[in-house]
């Protein structure tokens, strides 16, 4: 092996180590910034109140289709047998009684139940938007349609999947010894597969952000692993320690269910944070990083890109923006885009591309400075991509902004008070 190839391999290894270490630090910061444990506690509390209305919607959808009626009990048993701790199974009886008494509910009661369900779904969407650093939520009508589609289609797909599985496993192939072993193995694997598919769909559908499948899959895998660990831990504790029953008595199912929902949300949100971090992370060498305080340089370059795209009658999606401006992090890009949208300088089209909404020739720099609340740095720092046309234009504008400040900021602070009256005796 030549010396040149050896040097190249060592450089790649060092770069990979630096990339891995950088991603580890980035992931840890995102975990801390997302405050996932507080968010999981809030979602667990609202989820408990949404269980009854959720069950009403789910089984109401199944009741609307006579073909799925026979699968209601099977679906309920499958959920509680595989996803709920045994000590909290008494909740199943409560839900069944609530569904039997559905006809006795008043209009006000039904409105309250539906409102609690919508509040829970809205809280879930807000949490996921926060994890993916999305500032603008969906319009209310679009949000409601997505909620309703997920609940109805999800329920129908779950029932159809169980019916299909029952049909397949009833074939003569699965009546043999090997076939029965395979069917038993598949049924044991089914809960994890259901968890994995559902979490992937949640990551892809719920946030107001384009989440790629290659980012959602590792996040969902982490969430499923954590949920299985939680299941095992719950089973071990509840099977060996009965203190909680002596403390809570007949009410022991409620705190166990609440803790179970909380830990499940922690698992899902940790997976979401991993998926978000994978989509947001971009390894930047030192020379390509935007110095702190020079965000205005990135903003001016970004607007130059939008101006050029408008001349060609095009918009820019977020992946294209990051490819054109490698010094922008995903977080900074989202912040700049949201601010520019807030002041109606940018808008999104039906394909989620960003477009200029106003002519830059009539937008003063003062509006950008005041609205985006960016500082004008006085010191000189090496700037990435400074020699290309966009960098030259942005650097020239930045120099014009800070030149008058330099002479003012160079004077001693004491000179500001020379015209004040003398100190009192």
From Swiss-Prot:
Keywords: Cell inner membrane, Cell membrane, Membrane, Transmembrane, Transmembrane helix. The chain crosses the membrane at residues 48-68, 105-125, 154-174, 182-202, 216-236, 250-270. InterPro entries: UPF0761_bac (IPR023679), Virul_fac_BrkB (IPR017039). Its main location: membrane. Belongs to the UPF0761 family. It is a multi-pass membrane protein. This is UPF0761 membrane protein xcc-b100_3490. GO terms for cellular component: plasma membrane. It is found in: Cell inner membrane. NCBIfam families: PRK04214.1 (NF003256), yihY_not_rbn (TIGR00765).
């Amino acid at each position: 092996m030549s010396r040149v190839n050896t040097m190249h391999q060592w450089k790649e290894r060092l770069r990979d180590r630096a990339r891995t270490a950088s991603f580890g630090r980035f992931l840890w910061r995102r975990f801390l910034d997302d405050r996932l444990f507080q968010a999981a506690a809030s979602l667990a509390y609202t989820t408990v109140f949404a269980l009854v209305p959720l069950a009403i919607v789910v089984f109401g959808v199944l009741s609307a289709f006579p073909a799925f009626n026979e699968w209601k009990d099977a679906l309920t048993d499958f959920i509680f047998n595989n996803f709920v701790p045994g000590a909290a199974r008494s909740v199943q009886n409560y839900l069944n009684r609530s569904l039997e008494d559905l006809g006795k509910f008043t209009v006000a009661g039904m409105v309250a139940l539906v409102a609690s369900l919508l509040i829970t779904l809205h809280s879930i969407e807000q949490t996921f938007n926060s994890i993916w650093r999305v500032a603008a939520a969906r319009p209310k009508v679009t949000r409601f349609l997505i909620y309703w589609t997920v609940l109805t289609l999800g329920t129908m797909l779950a029932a159809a999947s169980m019916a299909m599985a029952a049909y397949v496993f009833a074939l003569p192939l699965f009546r043999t010894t090997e076939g029965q072993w395979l069917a038993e193995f598949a049924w044991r694997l089914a809960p994890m597969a259901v968890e994995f598919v559902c979490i992937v769909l949640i990551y892809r559908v719920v946030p107001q952000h384009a989440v790629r499948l290659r980012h959602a899959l590792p996040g969902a895998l982490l969430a499923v692993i954590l949920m299985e660990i939680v299941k095992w831990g719950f089973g071990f504790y509840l099977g060996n320690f009965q203190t909680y029953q002596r403390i809570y008595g007949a009410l022991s199912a409620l705190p166990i269910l609440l803790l179970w929902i909380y830990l499940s949300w922690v698992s899902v949100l940790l997976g979401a944070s991993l998926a978000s971090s994978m989509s947001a992370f971009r390894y930047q060498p030192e020379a390509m990083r935007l110095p702190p305080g020079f965000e205005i340089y990135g903003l001016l370059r970004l607007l130059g890109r939008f101006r050029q795209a408008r001349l060609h009658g095009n918009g820019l999606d977020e992946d294209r923006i990051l490819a054109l401006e490698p010094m922008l992090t995903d977080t900074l890009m989202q912040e700049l885009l949201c601010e520019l949208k807030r002041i109606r300088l940018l808008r999104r089209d039906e394909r989620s591309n960003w477009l200029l909404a106003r002519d830059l020739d009539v937008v003063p720099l003062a509006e950008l400075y005041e609205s985006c609340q960016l500082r004008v740095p006085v010191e000189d720092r090496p700037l990435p991509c400074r020699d290309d046309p966009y960098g030259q234009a942005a650097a020239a504008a930045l120099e014009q902004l800070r030149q008058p400040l330099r002479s003012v900021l160079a004077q001693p602070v004491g000179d500001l008070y020379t015209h004040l009256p003398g100190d009192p005796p």
